[in-house]
A protein has these predicted regions:
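Non-catalytic, mostly N-terminal accessory regions of nucleic-acid modification and defense proteins
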Residues: 1-177
């Protein structure tokens, strides 16, 4: 029986996640120049991480949203239901987005618009709305979403710790620099 060094395990996990994410660049080839890949990959990684974090409490958030949608201030209720400082009230997941290629742009925008204001602010600062349009116009949006749906692209906290996720982002930023 061999015991794996936890440091090597962490390093391998970070490299694996960064490589899976980096492979999305293959889908962008042609419509994007290599120096532009980060315009898509970094915000998509943020979106996928948030999505995967929220997946276990998704139904609780949707139920709470139905219960408080008439209230002027509902943010605190929804944060509590999600267990995070952010939430998503959209009925979409990456899996349901993947199931409807015909309406991918509208559905993905509805998914993004379902995030709490703090997440939408982050994505706006990254100029992600323009990239969604550009990917859709280039017929790439669906494929990028499919690429992020793989089992290896699972970025839930049970697969990738917060510290590891920081290293994954650092690795990606270095690749795009």
């Amino acid at each position: 029986m061999s015991i794996e060094n936890p440091i090597h395990s962490v390093g391998r996990n970070i490299q694996e996640k960064a490589s899976v994410i980096w492979n999305v660049a293959n889908s962008l080839f042609g419509a994007y120049k290599p120096h532009e890949y980060g315009l898509v990959i970094l915000p998509m990684t943020v979106v996928k991480r948030f999505h995967d974090c929220l997946l276990p409490t998704r139904q609780a958030v949707l139920d709470k949203y139905e219960a408080v949608r008439h209230l002027a201030v509902k943010d605190g209720f929804l944060r509590e239901a999600s267990g995070y400082a952010f939430y998503n009230t959209s009925p979409f997941t990456f899996e349901t987005l993947r199931a409807d290629a015909e309406n991918i742009e509208d559905n993905f925008r509805a998914f993004i618009n379902g995030f709490s204001d703090n997440v939408q602010d982050i994505l706006a600062q990254m100029g992600f709305g323009e990239q969604i349009k550009r990917m859709a116009d280039s017929n790439l949006l669906y494929q990028v979403i499919v690429d992020f749906c793989s089992e290896k692209a699972d970025m839930s906290p049970r697969k990738v710790t917060a510290v590891d996720m920081g290293y994954v982002f650092e690795n990606l930023v270095q690749r795009f620099s």
